[in-house]
Structures are given as structure tokens and as C-alpha cells.
Amino acid sequence: MLKVVGMKEINAIFEVTDRLGINREWIEIPLSPESPGVVRKLPNGKYEIVVDAGVPIEQWAAAMETELKKLL
């Protein structure tokens, strides 16, 4: 189980958000993962991406992309 979000997870998130054309300044990634992970649009227009602590990042990134597309 993931305890802290590291560069591997952040790079996987940015790979997806870059592909979707979302500016990195509009992404908030808490360094504490949770289970389940969460993708939501905040009232200020930014996207909060909370990494899922119990799912490998490669698998979770695909689910995250699906959720982000719903919010665009």
C-alpha cells in the first residue's frame, strides 16, 4: 500500500493531464494517498487528484483519465 505520493506517481498523473491539455498549474496533487483515490474539480476551477493508495499507479492512471474526461 502506497504511503506517500512520489515522483513516479506525479509523473504518471502529468502524463495523463498533459495529454488532455490540462495546464499543470491547474492540478493539485496531495502527497498523502487515500483509498479510494479521488478526482474532482474544485470550486476554484482546479482539479484535485488524490492518488489511490491501494491500486498500482499504472492501473489507477487509466481510471483517473476516465474521471478527468467526465470533468472537462
Residue ranges: model-predicted function:
Residues 6-15, 33-35, 41, 53:
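Residue-level detector of functional hotspots within protein domains
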Residues 1-25:
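A metal-dependent hydrolase signature that marks the N-terminal structural subdomain at the beginning
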Residues 29-46, 58:
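Catalytic zinc-binding patch centered on the HExxH motif and its immediate surroundings
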Residues 49-63:
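Short pre-active-site segment immediately N-terminal to the catalytic Zn-binding motif
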Residues 40-53, 69:
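Short, charge-rich amphipathic interface segments used for partner binding and complex assembly
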Residues 1-2, 43-46, 63:
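Short, structured interface segments that constitute the first stable element of a domain
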